[in-house]
Amino acid sequence: MVSERKTPYPAFNFTVNFNAAEIFGGFSDVSGIMTELTVAEYREGTDPENHVRKAQGIHKVGDVTLKRGVIDSETMWDWMQQARTQGPAAKKDVVITMLDEKREPVQKWTIRGAFPLKLTGPTLAGKGGGDLATEEVVLSCEAVDFGELGA
């Protein structure tokens, strides 16, 4: 008998992997994993009911934002350049895996057909303060799949 977990998983244990790409550096934040259906509203002119009927419309996904510390790697900037010059050939699949306290995978999202939409470099300040230099990439994607871990 498999027992179901009653407490939520911590949000700070996760991995980000880019299929067929060498993107290095650990990411500190992932946000925007979202999928939704639009609603198509209609009403037939002869319908005796005086209300709008609703049907499922087009499936949409949101942009996914990733943040990481700046490291000695230009792979994100290179990917942005590929997206500008190579078009659809620059698309990659991104797999985000949430881990439990033992660092075992528990949930997985596959961001399909992703490409960088926006890349923001670090905010630098001469006054110091101990903050780390971080960069942010916003990915546009075609689909988000919530998948089984063995798949």
PLM regions: where:
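Glycine-rich, low-complexity intrinsically disordered segments
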Residues: 1-151
